[in-house]
């Protein structure tokens, strides 16, 4: 699926020297027009700061490029401690609640959009697609 085909995005990024990783900024500079006016969720990770500093800079960059970051987000501290012996990610309850809040808010937005679409077009909305991008 190309970036333009999705209805929203979730960006999963580490904190890199107190800011976004260069790969994330490069991707935004390369295909931002395809992402214009679409919602974006954020999952950040790092050590003690949970990648929050990076996510704040990312949100500013996204709005500048006409991508709409959501308020709800997932922040994962001490990322290396979140994996079991088999290297499977083991989220804490807080991570699960944050992820559910992010997806619930997006579902509410979709519902509102579907109501508006139905009112305007007298048709039901299509199924929405939300890809994840890992940087």
Role assignments for model-derived ranges:
Residues 70-135:
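Glycine-rich phosphate/pyrophosphate-binding loop and the adjoining helix
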């Amino acid at each position: 699926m190309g970036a333009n085909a999705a209805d929203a995005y979730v960006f999963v990024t580490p904190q890199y020297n107190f800011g976004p990783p260069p790969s994330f900024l490069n991707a935004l500079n390369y295909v931002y027009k395809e992402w214009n006016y679409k919602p974006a969720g954020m999952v950040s990770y790092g050590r003690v700061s949970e990648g929050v500093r990076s996510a704040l800079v990312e949100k500013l960059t996204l709005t500048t490029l006409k991508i709409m970051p959501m308020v709800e987000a997932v922040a994962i501290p001490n990322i290396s401690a979140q994996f079991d012996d088999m290297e499977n990610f083991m989220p804490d309850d807080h991570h699960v609640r944050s992820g559910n809040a992010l997806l619930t808010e997006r579902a509410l937005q979709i519902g509102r959009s579907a109501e508006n679409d139905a009112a305007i077009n007298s048709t039901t909305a299509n199924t929405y697609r939300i890809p994840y991008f890992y940087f």
